[in-house]
C-alpha cells in the first residue's frame, strides 16, 4: 500500500494541472490493516515525495537515538556486535515508526489530492480488453466460509481504467 499510494502521490504532483481520476482498491477493511510491523524509516524518499511532511504531521515521532546490535546466545546472555562490523546498520537521522500509521497518513495525503481510496475491496480478477489490462473485478461479498452465497451476497464490481492499471503487493 505504501508503494501504491506513494506512486500515486508522485504522479499527481507531477501532473498537477491534468484532470485525473485515480482509484486505489485496498483488500484490508482499513488502510494499513495488513501492515503489522514496525520499521526503522529513512526519510529520503518521503523528503522527495512530500517535502513538507513534518509540517503535515507525518507519523514520524520517534527519532533513533542509539544503535545496538547483539548476538543472542541464550535467554540470558548476549554479545555486543561492534558497529564497524555492521556499517549499514547506522540509523542516525532515521525514525522508529508504525508502518500502518504511515500507510494511513499517506492515504490521507493522497485523498487530499483527489485520489479515491476504497478499503475492503480486493481485486479478484483482471479484466482484459484487446489483449491489454483494462481493469479489475473486485471480490464477491456475502459468502459463507464454504463459499456459498448468503442472503447478503453481492457479486464483485467491474472497475475499468481509462489509462493504466497498477498492481502492487507489499511495501
Regions of interest found by a model, annotated:
Residues 57-171:
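Feature captures the FAD/FMN-dependent oxidoreductase FAD-binding
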Residues 2-6, 20-27, 127-129, 134, ...:
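Hydrophobic, aliphatic-enriched repeat segments that assemble into extended interaction scaffolds
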Residues 3, 7-11, 108, 112:
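Short, well-ordered alpha-helices that flank and scaffold nucleotide-derived cofactor binding pockets
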Residues 17-18, 158:
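Residue-level detector of alpha-helix boundary/anchor positions
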Residues 8, 12, 18-76:
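N-terminal FAD cofactor-binding segment of flavoenzymes
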